Amino acid sequence: TFLTPEENGHVTSLWGKVDVEKVGGEALGRLLVVYPWTQRFFESFGDLSTPSAIMGNPKVKAHGKKVLSAFSEGLHHLDNLKGTFAQLSELHCDKLHVDPQNFTLLGNVLVIVLAEHFGNAFSPPVQAAFQKVVTGVANALAHKYH
């Protein structure tokens, strides 16, 4: 794995306390608010007209949970992220035509949401470990792009 044993401990310890539904919905919602051009992939989700509409949108929350559940699964396979995310990479590349840069943006937003939720427990070493993970996941998701 690309994490040191200490970093792996930080990630495992904190992730056990993460509310996947809440954090996932918030992270995807923030992505759509902060980077409005990402909304074009979610036009079927209904009202995305204001930040409060986005953050309260049940479809955004549900998809955010789905995204973070997949991320959570990836944490069990840090030694094979490309294999773990191969199908999702293909889907987002070939079918949805998502700009792979969006995976990096979402990873960075996730780090911000975790910092907000965990405060002082999200120390610089913990942040550094999570930054490595979200970068690894973003790279794995971008893997199928030509």
Curated annotation (Swiss-Prot):
Residues 2-146 form the Globin domain. Heme b binds at H63, H92. Pfam families: Globin (PF00042). Keywords: Acetylation, Heme, Iron, Metal-binding, Oxygen transport, Phosphoprotein, S-nitrosylation, Transport. Disulfide bonds: none annotated. CDD domains: Hb-beta-like (cd08925). The modification Phosphothreonine is found at T12. The modification Phosphoserine is found at S44. PROSITE patterns: GLOBIN. The modification N6-acetyllysine is found at K59, K82, K144. One of its GO terms (cellular component) is hemoglobin complex. InterPro entries: Globin, Globin-like_sf, Globin/Proto, Hemoglobin_b, Hemoglobin_oxygen_transport. Red blood cells. The modification S-nitrosocysteine is found at C93. One of its GO terms (molecular function) is metal ion binding. It comes from the Eukaryota. The keyword Phosphoprotein applies. GO terms for biological process: hydrogen peroxide catabolic process. Belongs to the globin family. Heterotetramer of two alpha chains and two beta chains. Involved in oxygen transport from the lung to the various peripheral tissues. This is Hemoglobin subunit beta. It comes from Hapalemur griseus. The lineage of its organism: Eukaryota, Metazoa, Chordata, Craniata, Vertebrata.
